[in-house]
Amino acid sequence: MKIRKKSYGNCNMVGRNIERLRKERGIKQKDFISKMQTMGCDINPTSYSKLEGQLRIATDKEIYTVARILTVSMEDLFE
């Protein structure tokens, strides 16, 4: 597992939780991105990394898709 090179930003509230939940489920970042793309999210690895790192704003579609993949409510991503 790679160590995060940069500290977390403050552009969104969900990035850390997405990263934590994804890792708890043993899903690799590249596999998670593929699932998001399959579900209609136009996202690339750099953009996804910035999302988890809280370095960019998360769209409503991304939050919805992530919640579905992780089988959690959207509200859970904000806790």
Predicted feature residues:
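Short, conserved catalytic or interaction motifs in soluble domains
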Residues: 53
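Short alpha-helical DNA-recognition segment
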Residues: 26-50
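DNA major-groove recognition helix of helix-turn-helix/homeodomain DNA-binding modules
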Residues: 59-76
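Short polybasic/polar patches that bind polyanions
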Residues: 23, 37, 68
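Helix-turn-helix DNA-binding elements, focusing on the entry/boundary residues of the two helices
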Residues: 18, 29, 45, 60-63
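A short, Lys/Arg-rich alpha-helix, primarily the initiator
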Residues: 1-25
